[in-house]
Every structure is written in structure tokens, then in C-alpha cells.
Amino acid sequence: MSFAEKPFGVRIRTMGDIAERKFEERSVVDWVRYGLCRPPIDMSALPPELRYTPDYLTAQGLVEVQGLGQDQTLKVKHDKLEALRWWSKIHPVFLFVYDSHKDRHSLLSLEDLTKRCKESDTQSFPEGKPYFAIKSSLIWGDV
């Protein structure tokens, strides 16, 4: 069973762990943990700006970490992108993308991420939340 096929309750327990570990291993700058990591509160009750607090703080900017897998599609929720724009008013924002299927990573500025979102289709998760479906070819230039 692929990660995407597992029930959400199972996926949420490890969601982001692999990608965050890769960021910590591969970062060339000093960082500190910054964002919320599965806190024991109702996240849906929080405003998006708090819900999507970037994962790491560096002297160069805030870093949100997100992974993609076998389907080779980075799924960026619309409200997450808006929250990251809000954070960018305080400190530059970057997205560290880790592809666990091909063991590769990329660091995108918020400007680059926004451009790729505009070039991508909008789809929806089963619960109805819209997201930008960014194909890996828009990140790494592969076919």
C-alpha cells in the first residue's frame, strides 16, 4: 500500500518527517525548528497563518518543508500559499521540496513556488480543499 493510499489518520502520524529529516541533513545553513509539529490541538480552529507556520527559521529566511512521492506531484494547498505570502512580509520564505521516490531535493523561493503554482492545475483533496498540483517536471525539469 502506497503512502497516499493509507488512511489520513495513519499518514498524519509521519507526514513530513522524511522530508524534514532530509532538510536537516542537507541544509547548508544553520537552522532552528520553528513551526508546529502535530501539536495536540485542533489545527482547523487556527487561522491559516498559524496553521502553516513555516517549519524552520534560518538567518536567510523561513523554510517550509514538503515532500512528494511516487505520483511525482507536489500538492500545495491554496490557503497554505496565502499563509506563506503573509509570512514573507516578515522574513523571506522558501520551500524545501524532497522527492522520496527519487531521493532528490530542491529549494524554491516563494516567488519561484508562486510561478510554478500558476503553471499548474488546481485539484481538490477528498475533503474538498483545493491545491495546486505541481508536477515534478516544473521543479526539476525532468520529463
Task: Tell what function each PLM region has.
Residues 24, 81-85:
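Short amphipathic alpha-helical segments and helix-helix/interface helices
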Residues 27, 54-70:
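Conserved catalytic cores of phosphodiester-cleaving nucleases, focusing on short active-site segments
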Residues 33, 62-64, 94-98:
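A structural signal for short, well-ordered beta-strand segments and their strand-loop junctions
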Residues 69-81:
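Active-site-adjacent loop/helix micro-motif of nuclease/hydrolase catalytic cores
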Residues 85-113:
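Nucleic-acid nuclease catalytic cores
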Residues 106-143:
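Intrinsically disordered, low-complexity terminal regions enriched in charged/polar residues
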